[in-house]
Swiss-Prot record:
The lineage of its organism: Viruses, Riboviria, Orthornavirae, Duplornaviricota, Resentoviricetes. Its EC number is 2.7.7.48. RNA-directed RNA polymerase that is involved in both transcription and genome replication. Together with VP3 capping enzyme, forms an enzyme complex positioned near the channels situated at each of the five-fold vertices of the core. Following infection, the outermost layer of the virus is lost, leaving a double-layered particle (DLP) made up of the core and VP6 shell. VP1 then catalyzes the transcription of fully conservative plus-strand genomic RNAs that are extruded through the DLP's channels into the cytoplasm where they function as mRNAs for translation of viral proteins. This is RNA-directed RNA polymerase. It catalyses: RNA(n) + a ribonucleoside 5'-triphosphate = RNA(n+1) + diphosphate.
Length: 1088
């Protein structure tokens, strides 16, 4: 404890280093006597600082406070309006500033020209192509780096080398930024024309990326990669990341497998010591050579040399360097193009008549048959979800944009908003709601567009379709996904699997007589040639399905779905280009429909099947697996003979030729040992993930607060670290300090302490120890948690006003009325709350709530006020358990080989001792009988929180709850009267606790919690039949053991003697646990 507070104090002295600056620490304690001393101490500090006296004497006088109380926050003030950044920067700006090469990029605006050359006037200016979109500024980032450098200038040995490497790289950044002056951001952290006009347009986003890279430098190799990327990304804003990461798709095919993990029948990973040789035809080496040449042409030298050196013996031991280069390439930042170029990109492809109609026919038929297969059962059985598809759609309507701003009346309040949910309410109130009519998206009503930016790829456009499209597609797509959930081919949706399962699936069938074909079909998904056969296949499937039922409502659902496909075959988009809005006929498939993911997966599966059926005319092989995962598909083919170089080359060329016959511009590769797809890559029998999450640049702006973004920053840092890209932790902590500080006045600022930011309260931002989620059980921790709970949710006047309007009330009661067969307060209140929560995405409401939250927080950070809360948190439960455990030292041998080489050592060690898990632990209650019963008769999906509440009610209340949702009385009676109900109580509690303990997030998702090796370290004598208590005791013990191992690299064993009398008490408490949402949990969820 306390590392953060120490750095915080040093950081404040670094930033406010003038005479007038003062730091006042604020302490608190759960002990009332000590708490009084804390209050005295604080008021005397304020008194002294007002009179300009030193605080040193007070620190001595109140040493009891400083030793025994807990730091709550630091109040800091300084009269210096600090343009200190510029002053400090000069010290580092000793090098030669970079000069941008203005001819590197094809599109003029992607060259790093002076802003006024790209945008001659303020009216033409837009920051949308370089907006870092993050609530922290370049000056803060520079400060954070300079703080680190100053703190470490006296390091020795290996640490000194790191310091020198980073200093050298920072000199490049500082000199370049200093040449033009540090761009000042406005209150919204944006960079305006006045600031940018005489500076290079991409200066800010480049500097942010460069800082992120240089603060991730440790070794000499890191330094070489970073230097090259920093220097080149200053000029090349378009293709650098793609150039650097391209070779990976071939590199994975060059490494022999010598021992690997495979999936066994029980879907667990098990070690197999098979040897598979990498068989690589010359053609592949030629392609790789071409890629390296392209890199050199673009000015890269060190990176291609590293790859070249590795090629000498292609060893898996040195492969992590290749993985590192691949990950680093993404940290050059997002490629943000103009919308017009993004749209035209897909329309440029030449349409040729010279295509294989037979293959297209087969492709369309496969799509048709798959759609039929997916929906056949629900349609034949007149599934209630397909009957009540409209209601289901309304219940899960998002609060995203509906594409146009409208003026809406809620009671006496008139607002204008683009949000779907508000438009639906307004339309219903005014009799304009017609879900049975799908509006056209033709030349008269072109589709407005959103965008998706990603490093190393072009900007993609997203359709923002009217909400009728969502309602028409929702129910059908949900049914498709349910089918995909138990179909192994759909790697992305397959039931509770994680990426390790997909890894074992590939390695399972690799051998000397098989090869794996992997294809990136992202180009095909958005190509014009895809759209006709794609939509027609879906339409034909829907027509066949409509003949399988006589239910008018199901037929209506299918027809509306069909109508969305028909409309989209004639689609136009609107693109703002300067002041004009261009209408362009857009013939390709874009994201934005509800069906995007499901339908793309269907199409990609159909595509690879079409190609394989062609190839099988020429070769004799068995298809061992076919998988599709997002934009990628792959298949393992097993031949009767050993694979030779000639075979690999022939198959490879035939596959490419087959794709070419459909005019599909795709990257198809064949290998014997590894694959590379967007989500993961397998090389030498080991699995790797790309650690490419940008920290200091964001894709887009949302309505999250600085606190939220600080939590997301930390969460991104953790994910990158697990994947092998480590950024200096002190730097991350410094960013968190900057982003969580609260300004009181111009010169007064409050910085929360570690305790505030790491206790699991509604304000939690990060973990005091990476990878370990701690639930504080000391008096002070529980005290502060209670204090924060008292100010958890803030009211918003606007939201209350909208919620009180008849428009809103009628909407909610219409939903309840359609859903419920009898009164059910839990559900009605749930719907009302959900709808009210959706209003949060309307900016004025979130702003209002944020202001209230900040002012409450300010009060709290200066003096915590507790209230006697009846709420119980998971901390209280663990606090009750803790005293009954005794700890002993233990020993666990390493017994599993490494298969994820990029993991940090301490996490790797645990997997090597207890093994890994290939499944997600169920934490949403969907496996419980009650959840299944509800989904059998109703479109309503209760959350885990609601199930947890309901299952602990009296039996007759549960019956009423079920009956009101349309479950027949006989089923409800049977349920409550059976054993299943008591199993459900346990099951749902278990899910709920797993959910609270974030078992499926961070590094916990990698560990096998049911490992016998882990079990044997825990001894809990069995007393009485309270499975829920036994469960929580075991889970707590496992987490304690694992956390200790992460921290210390050694094992402990736990013995628990839990008194039977306490068990009943604990069991009762366990039914009143409150769940806490925090920026931290939201960030975890956001990762998903």
């Amino acid at each position: 404890m306390g590392k953060y507070n120490l750095i915080l104090s040093e950081y404040l002295s670094f930033i406010y280093n003038s005479q007038s600056a003062v730091q006042i620490p604020i302490y608190y304690s759960s002990n009332s006597e000590l708490e009084n001393r804390c209050i005295e101490f604080h008021s005397k500090c304020l008194e002294n600082s007002k009179n300009g006296l030193s605080l040193k004497k007070l620190f001595v006088e109140y040493s009891d406070v400083m030793e025994n109380a807990t730091l709550l926050s630091i109040l800091s003030y300084s009269y210096d309006k600090y343009n200190a950044v510029e002053r400090k920067l000069v010290k580092y700006a000793k090098g030669k500033p970079l000069e941008a090469d203005l001819t590197v990029n094809e599109l003029d605006y992607e060259n790093n020209k002076i802003t006024s050359e790209l945008f001659p006037t303020a009216e033409e200016y837009t920051d949308s192509l370089m907006d870092p979109a993050i609530l922290t500024s370049l000056s803060s980032n520079l400060n954070a780096v300079m703080f680190w450098l100053e703190k470490h200038e006296n390091d020795v040995a290996e640490k000194l080398k790191i310091y020198k490497r980073r200093l050298d790289l920072f000199t490049i950044v500082a000199s370049t930024v200093n040449k033009y002056g540090v761009p000042r951001h406005n209150a919204k952290y944006r960079y305006e024309y006045e600031v940018m006009k005489d500076k290079p347009y991409y200066l800010v986003t480049w500097a942010n990326s460069s800082i992120e890279m240089l603060m991730s430098v440790f070794s000499h190799e890191d330094y070489l990669i970073a230097r090259e990327l920093i220097v080149l990304s200053y000029s090349n804003r378009s293709t650098l990341a793609k150039l650097v990461s391209s070779p990976m798709s071939i590199l994975v095919a060059l490494v022999d497998i010598n021992g690997t993990f495979i999936t066994n029948e029980e879907l667990e990973l098990e070690f197999s010591n098979k040897y598979v040789r990498a068989i690589v035809p010359d053609q592949t080496f030629d392609e790789l050579k071409q890629m390296l040449d392209n890199m050199r042409k673009a000015g890269l030298t060190d990176i291609p040399k590293m790859i070249q050196d590795w090629l000498v013996d292609c060893s898996i031991e040195k492969f992590p360097l290749m993985a590192k280069i691949y990950s680093w390439s993404f940290h050059v930042g997002f490629r943000k193009q103009k919308m017009l170029d993004a749209a035209l990109d897909q329309l440029k492809t030449e349409y040729t008549e010279d295509v294989d109609d037979e293959m297209y026919r087969e492709y369309t038929m496969l799509i048709r048959d798959e759609v039929v297969k997916m929906l056949e059962e629900p349609v034949k059985h007149d599934d209630h979800l397909l009957q009540d598809s409209e209601l289901a759609g309304l219940l899960s309507m998002s609060s995203a944009s509906n594409g146009e701003s409208r003026q809406l009346k809620f009671g006496r309040k008139t607002i204008f908003s683009t949000k779907k949910n508000m438009h639906v309410m307004d339309d219903m109130a005014n009799g304009r709601y017609t879900p049975g009519i799908i509006p056209p998206v033709n030349v008269d009503k072109p589709i407005p567009l959103g965008r998706r930016d990603v490093p190393g790829r072009r900007t993609r456009i997203i359709f923002i379709l009217p909400y009728e499209y969502f309602i028409a597609q929702h129910a059908v797509v949900e049914k498709m996904l349910i089918y995909a959930k138990h179909t192994r081919e759909y790697a992305e949706f397959y039931s509770q699997s994680n990426q390790l399962l997909s890894y074992g699936d590939v390695t399972r069938f690799l051998s000397n007589n098989s090869m794996v074909l992997y294809t990136d079909v992202s180009q095909w998904d958005s190509s014009q040639h895809n759209t006709q056969p794609f939509r027609k296949g879906i339409i034909m499937g829907l027509d066949m399905l409509a003949n399988m039922t006589n239910d008018a409502r199901v037929i209506q659902t299918l027809n509306l779905y069909k109508q969305t496909q028909i409309n989209l075959m004639d689609s136009y988009v609107q693109i703002p280009d300067g002041n004009v809005i261009k209408k362009i006929q857009y013939g390709a498939v874009a994201s934005g429909e509800k069906q995007t993911k499901a339908a793309n997966s269907i199409a990609n599966l159909a595509l690879i099947k079409t190609v394989l059926s062609r190839i099988s005319n020429k070769y004799s092989f068995a298809t061992k697996i076919i998988r599709v995962d997002g934009d990628d598909n792959y298949a393992v083919l097993q031949f009767n003979t050993e694979v030779t170089e000639q075979m690999v080359q022939d198959v490879s060329n035939d596959v490419r030729e087959t794709y070419a016959r459909m005019n599909a511009k795709v990257k198809a590769l064949v290998s014997t040992v590894g694959i590379e797809i967007a989500k993961r890559y397998i090389a030498g029998g080991k699995i790797f993930f790309r650690a490419g999450i940008n920290l200091l640049n964001n894709e887009k702006r949302g309505q999250s607060t600085q606190w939220d973004q600080a939590a997301v920053l930390y969460s991104n840092y953790i994910v990158n670290r697990l994947r092998g890209f480590e950024t200096d932790r002190e730097f991350i902590l410094t960013k968190i300090m900057q982003m969580t500080s609260v300004a009181i006045t111009g010169s007064l600022r409050l910085f929360p302490s570690e305790r505030v930011l790491t206790t699991n309260s509604t304000f939690k931002v990060f973990d005091s120890e990476d990878f370990i989620i701690e639930y504080g059980t000391t008096d002070d921790e529980v005290y502060i948690q209670r204090a924060f709970m008292s100010l958890s949710s803030q009211k918003s006047g606007i939201a209350d006003e909208i919620a009180a309007s008849s428009t809103f009330k009628n909407y909610v009661s219409r939903l309840s009325g359609q859903l419920l067969f009898s009164k059910n307060n839990i559900v009605s209140r749930g719907i009302a709350l959900t709808e009210k929560a959706k209003l949060n995405s309307y900016a004025p409401i979130s702003l209002e709530k944020r202001r209230a939250q900040i002012s409450a927080l300010l009060t709290m950070l200066q003096k915590p006020v507790t209230f006697k809360s009846s709420k119980i948190t998971i901390n209280d439960i663990l606090r009750d358990i803790k005293p009954f455990f005794t700890v002993n030292e233990a020993h666990l041998p390493i017994q599993y080989q490494k298969f994820m080489p990029t993991l940090p050592d301490n996490v790797q060690y645990i997997i090597q001792c207890i093994g890994s898990r290939t499944y997600q632990i169920e934490d949403d209650g969907s496996k419980s009988a009650i959840s299944r019963l509800i989904s059998k008769y109703s479109v309503y999906k209760p959350s885990i929180e609601e199930l947890y509440k309901v299952i602990s009610l009296h039996e007759n209340e549960i019956q009423l709850y079920l009956i009101s949702l349309g479950i027949p009385k006989i089923d409800a009676d049977t349920y409550v009267g059976s054993k299943i109900y008591s199993q459900d109580k346990y099951r749902i509690l278990e899910s709920y606790v797993c959910n609270l303990l974030s078992i499926n997030y961070g590094c916990y998702q990698l560990f096998d919690f049911n490992s016998p090796d882990l079990e044997k370290l825990i001894r809990i004598p069995f007393k009485g039949k309270i499975p829920a208590v036994t469960f929580i005791l075991h889970l707590y013990a496992k987490l304690e053991v694992i956390n200790h191992a992460i921290k210390n690299g050694s094992w402990i064993s736990l013995f628990c003697n839990y008194p039977k009398s306490e068990m009943i008490k604990l069991w009762k408490k366990m039914w009143n646990i409150t769940s806490l949402r925090s920026p931290y949990t939201n960030a975890n969820f956001f990762q998903d």
